[in-house]
Amino acid sequence: MIAMKPARTLAMAGALALFASQAAHAQWLDLYGTRKNVSASPAAPMLKNATCQPELADRPIELEDAILQAICANPQARRAWADARAQAAQLGVKEAAYLPTLNATAGIQRNWQTTTYEQDLGPITLTADQKQIQTSRYGALNLSWVLFDFGKRSAALRQARELLAAANATQDDTLQTLLFNAAQAYYNLRDTQAALDAARTTERVAQDSLTAAKAKHDAGAGTLSDQLQAQTSYRRAVLDRVSAEGDVRNATGVLAVAMGLDANTPLRIATAEPPVDRNAFAEGIAQLIDEAKRQHPKLVAARAKLDAARANVDAVRAQGRPTISLTGSLSRNSPSYQQQPGIQTTASHGSMIGVQVTIPLFEGFASGYRVAAAQAQADAQEADVQNTELNVSLDVWKSYQSLQTDTANLDNSKDLLGDAQRSLDIARGRYKAGVGTFTELLNAQTALADAQKQRVQALSKWRTARLKLAASLGSIGLWSAH
């Protein structure tokens, strides 16, 4: 019986385990430098010199705080970043196709076999057992290296690069969308707070008018009708104030969610009103549309996907071309036989190297259909690019016109508010002096409330139009949110 050689067996097993562990560890190494093609963090493309703040400071939230929290904590940013990293890894897969593949196979097995022979000698039957034990150890290394594939790998690599560019552009677009939503939610909360302040002012004015009407009625100088009208106006003002308080709570929840927080998170924003910058976007509409067509991330992503689709056409065409590969192998087989009465041991080992040419000859005309499908996908993507260009130009046009209108209404709403305030002061004085009617006072009071709402809406619409124009240009950033 042949004794097994445990040292050699353990050495072979250890070598294979070491090789396997190194191969498994290599998959975590970015040998092709693909990580440099994606951002270092989910919010890095938008942050520039700013930094993420893990916790909000104990102070009123500024607009920049809300934006940073939104792009740093919102799960949509992490999802877009993960998609970009996944596509970068796919680029590494395509790069790896240019290197050879090496596979190892090894094993050991032991077989036992017993054969019983019987011979009948009349009254006596002779029985003999023959035992055979086979131990086999084998190992092999197989090498395969594609030398020429007539453009298949290069087309696949080009496709992966374009898809990575599209993923990066999509990440940029996601961050800009998050910034826009956070800024809009922040300004919406500020606008609802301003509307609440206006509602409280209207309530105080209505209460003052009610007090004056009641005093005149008690003194016998006013009518009960005037007092009831004043009381009705006051009740309406209270209803408007309560509704405004609900709008503030809703707007607070929207901002919290935009910042990646729970909707019930209490927030306190700064009340200081930023200066109105009328000089932004002073370029002509044609120049703005051209700028959007150059840099809008949606268009950048669409064009990259078009280039990837065209590269896929080349890759599909190359599948029908020959492939030339270098192949090689090293093998060893050491079976050992132990049987009665003798011992037999054999071993074999060999090596091979060669060049293999694979030529697709016929596959049922499937290659032509694959090329046609890939070309149709490229045509569809080209149509998507044209459609995206039209949508971008329309968004820029509408946002630009809205900004022009809302900018003009800033002065109009300011003048309207001033006139309404002076009208109320005059009507109140005339009513107290007994020369004016309560209807005149009530009309002036209503006009002031409307003017306050118009002013709040004018500022809100101007800021929203400015944000939308920046977003339609694909250039929204921390600076444009202000």
What are these regions (language model features)?
Residues 26-99, 103, 113, 270-306, ...:
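Bacterial Sec-pathway N-terminal export signals of envelope proteins
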Residues 79-95, 174, 178-197, 208, ...:
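Amphipathic alpha-helical coiled-coil segments
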Residues 11-20:
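Bacterial N-terminal signal peptides
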Residues 173-291, 402, 406, 448-449, ...:
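Periplasmic alpha-helical coiled-coil/stalk elements that build and connect Gram-negative outer-membrane
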Residues 48-59, 105-142, 271-282, 314, ...:
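Small/polar, glycine/serine/threonine/aspartate-rich low-complexity segments that form flexible
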Residues 68-78, 85-101, 129, 133, ...:
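A glycine-/polar-enriched beta->alpha junction
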